[in-house]
C-alpha cells in the first residue's frame, strides 16, 4: 500500500510540474486580437514595430493577403519582444534574419514553441478583426453617402412641393377673381334676358299699334345688345390679358423654370440613387464572391494544416525522445521526494495506528462496562423475580386459606388478584428494559406481551387449582369473578 501511494504521488507531482511550467509561459506569451489592437493604438513599441509590415495588408484584404514569410517574421519578432520583456533567454538566430534556424530551435523547447505558435495564431485573429472593421467602416460610409443623397433629394422635393403649393394658391386666387367676374356677367346677362323678354312681350302688344316705333325700338335694342356684347368681349379680353400677365410674371420670376429644374434635378437624383444602388448591389455580389473564394482558400489552408500536423507529429515524436532524456535529470529529485514522502507516510501511518489502537481500547472498555452493567441489571432482575416468586408462594398460601371460608372468597380473591397483579406489574417493569435490549424489541410491546402472558397464566393456574378442590362448576364461577375483578382493576395497571 505504501509503494502504491508513493508511486501515485510521484506521478501527480511530475504531471503538475510539467503542466505548470508549460502553461505559465503560454499564458505569459499569448496575445489576443483585442490586446494587439489596443497595443497598436499606443505609442510605437516593440510589438507595434513587429506588426507594422503586415498591418496595411491586414486592414485592406485580411490575413489571406499577408505573405506567410511576413507573418512568420512578425510572429518571431513578437516572440522576441516577449522574451526580452520577460528576461527569458532565446536562440540568437531569432535576432537576425535566419528565421528558419530560429523556428527550428524554437521547436526544440515547448515553451518557446508555445509562444511562437500563439503569436502566429493571434496575428491571424488580429488581421481578421481589423479587416472586418475596415469592411464595416466602408459599408457604413456607403450607407452614409446613400443617406445623404436621399436626404438631399427629400429636401429638394419638399422645396419644389412648397413652391408648387404657393403657385397653386396664387392660381386659386386668380380663378376666384375670374369666378366673381363670371358671376357678375351671368347676373347681367340674366337681367338683360329678363329685360329682353319683357320688351318682347311689350313689343308683341305694341307691334300692332306702331310698327315704326317697333322698328326704332328694335334698332335701339340691337344697338344696346351689340354694346353689351362688346362689353362681354372686352371683359373676356381683359381676363385673357390678366392671365397672360400672370403667366408672364411667373416666367419672369423663374418659377416655371425652377419647376422644370427641380423636375430635372429630381430625375437626376433618382437616377444617381439608382446607379448607387446598382453599384452597392454589385459590390455586395463581389463581396459574396470574395467570401466564397475565402472559404475555398480556408479549405486549402485546412488541407495544408493537416499536412503540417503530420510533420508536427514527427516533431512531437522527436520531442518525446528528448523528454525521455530529460526524465533522467528528474530522477534524483524523484528519489529525494520518494524518501521524504516515505518518511511522512511512515509517521502518518504510525500515528494513525496509535490513534486506532486507542480508539479500539476505548471501544473495548465501553463494551465491557456496558456488558457488566447489563449483567448486574440481569442479576438484580433475577433476584427480584425470585423474591416475587416467594411472595407469590406466600400469597398462594393465603389464597388457599381464603377458600376455606367461602363467604369471604370474592373479597379474598380480589385482594389476592390485586396483590398478584401488582407484583406481576412490578416484575414486568423491572425486566422489560433488560429483555427489550437483549431481544431488540420495543419496551412497550414487550411489556404488553409479558403482561397478557402472565395474566393468562394466572387465570389458568387459578382455574386448575380451584377445579381440583371445588369442582369445575364452582371453578368456572370463581374464574368469572376473578376476570370481573381484573377487568375492574385494569386501570390500576
UniProtKB/Swiss-Prot annotation:
Residues 467-469 are cytoplasmic. GO terms for cellular component: endoplasmic reticulum membrane; nuclear membrane. The chain crosses the membrane at residues 446-466, 470-490. Residues 1-22 form the signal peptide. Residues 23-445, 491-493 are lumenal. Pfam families: Tht1 (PF04163). The keyword rRNA-binding does not apply. It is a multi-pass membrane protein. It comes from the Eukaryota. It is found in: Endoplasmic reticulum membrane; Nucleus membrane. Coiled coil: none annotated. Glycans are attached at residues 15, 145, 383. GO terms for biological process: karyogamy involved in conjugation with cellular fusion; nuclear membrane fusion involved in karyogamy. Keywords: Endoplasmic reticulum, Glycoprotein, Karyogamy, Membrane, Nucleus, Signal, Transmembrane, Transmembrane helix. Belongs to the KAR5 family. Required for nuclear membrane fusion during karyogamy. This is Nuclear fusion protein KAR5. It comes from Meyerozyma guilliermondii (strain ATCC 6260 / CBS 566 / DSM 6381 / JCM 1539 / NBRC 10279 / NRRL Y-324).
